[in-house]
Amino acid sequence: MMPSRTNLATGLPSSKVKYSRLASTDDGYIDLQFKKSPPKIPYKAIALATVLFLIGTFLIIIGSLLLSGYISKGGADRAVPVLIIGILVFLPGFYHLRIAYYASKGYRGYSYDDIPDFDD
């Protein structure tokens, strides 16, 4: 049988709980240095992506209406270049708007850093 510990100040036996002194928590760091700053939102790049998206959508609609003959009877010689330009303008706008949307919703793997900025 193990002898029980006694409290030296009072002479009473102590419980079996062992207490230890806490280490000093002052290690020179403050919590603010570990907090993330809010992300810098590239408003100009998002505005440009929106303009590209809208112009591309408009050109795709016009090109498809030209191709179907609804607007004029010019045929494919006018419609195909309009469709190609519309697709080339639409794709980067859609891509960057999608990144901006997912970054604003906080999806993992998407951030505003993925959108090119104008460095102003």
UniProtKB/Swiss-Prot annotation:
UniProt keyword annotation of Transmembrane present: yes
InterPro entries registered for this protein in UniProt: TMEM230, TMEM_230/134
TM ranges: 46-66, 79-99
S-adenosyl-L-methionine listed as a keyword: no
Highest taxon of the lineage: Eukaryota
Membrane topology (UniProt): Multi-pass membrane protein
Disulfide bonds listed in the record: none
Cellular localisation: Membrane; Cytoplasmic vesicle, Secretory vesicle, Synaptic vesicle; Golgi apparatus, trans-Golgi network; Early endosome
GO cellular component entries: autophagosome; axon; early endosome; endoplasmic reticulum; late endosome; membrane; recycling endosome; synaptic vesicle
Coiled-coil annotated residue ranges, if any: none
One annotated GO biological process: synaptic vesicle transport
Modified residues (Phosphoserine): S15, S24
Tissue expr: Widely expressed, including dopaminergic neurons in the substantia nigra.
Function: Involved in trafficking and recycling of synaptic vesicles.
Family label: Belongs to the TMEM134/TMEM230 family.
Protein's name according to its UniProt entry: Transmembrane protein 230
Organism: Mus musculus (Mouse)
